[in-house]
């Protein structure tokens, strides 16, 4: 399957869990399609990019290590995504990367996530937190920053400042996650 066939197939994806799961299995069964999926996902002015992001999220949920050969392209292009539904999936993938990187178990992502890739993720997550984004994107961003911040004190300091500043004006979902993250950060100080 080439990029045009994959693009056509993505027209069949809908927001249902079954649809996203079914299409993620197509990618997982042929990982040579993953770079093509990512190319489509970063056609950020095309609504089909959202469907590609949904599928990619499910690929990463099932097998996060599939992202390793594509980390550079993924991290360098994060900041370009602007559709809300794609941003939610992209921010969730960042959280999955951070969880794998922060895991106590040895895994290939720990070595593959180079400092510059972390910087791209951190920068995008801070942008999502301070700009007008949906709560799901912000929640995944704060989790990612908390996990990646374990390696750098400045990240936690900045995260605490933002969460405390924005706490009163944000939604209940934001507040619940912010309270949990703040508690975790303060317990490590």
Regions found by a protein language model. Give the residues of each.
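Alpha-helical scaffold domains
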Residues: 1-189
